[in-house]
Amino acid sequence: FHDIEKDVLAAIRYVQDKSDQPVILFGSGANGSLSLSAALSDSSVRAVVALSPGEYFMPAIKIQETISALQKPVFITSSKAEYPYVSELASGMEQKYVTLFEPKQGAGDRGTRSFSVDYEYNSEYWFALMLFFKDLM
C-alpha cells in the first residue's frame, strides 16, 4: 500500500510541475480507497472521486479511520448493493465534504462500469458527478 501511495504522490508532484490546475484524484475500487488516503498526504489535492472504495488494505490500513480526517470535497458512489457499505466507510468524515451518490435507476453498477456506455443508466452517475464538479467551481 505505502509503495503504491508513494507512486500516486509522485504523480501528483509531476502534474503540479506541469500545470497550475487543481488536482482531483479519481479512483475505482482499491484505487478509490488509495485516492482518498493520498488526498490526506498532499495539500495540492483539491478533491477526490472514489468509485466503489472499500477496505482493501486491512489490516495494515483501515481506510474508514484514515479518511475520517479528510477535509476536502469527496464524491463517492457505488452500486445499490454496495451503497450501505460505502456509506458506512464515509460515515466518519464531516458530511459537508461528502457527496455520496446512490443510484436510483436500476441496481447501479460497480466502479467505472457505472459510467460506461454499456451500462443502461450511466447518465444518472454522470449527472451526479457533473453536479459535484459544478460545486467545486
Range-by-range predicted roles:
Residues 98-137:
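C-terminal catalytic histidine-bearing segment of alpha/beta-hydrolase fold enzymes
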Residues 86-101:
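Conserved loop-alpha-helix segment in the C-terminal half of the alpha/beta-hydrolase fold
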Residues 70, 75-78:
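Short beta-strand/loop motif that positions the catalytic acidic residue
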Residues 54-71:
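Flexible "cap/lid" loop of the alpha/beta hydrolase fold
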Residues 26-35:
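Gly/Ala-rich beta-loop-alpha elbow adjacent to hydrolase catalytic centers
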Residues 43-56:
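A conserved short beta-strand
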Residues 1-18:
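Alpha/beta-hydrolase active-site loop
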Residues 57, 78-85:
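Acidic catalytic loop of the alpha/beta-hydrolase fold
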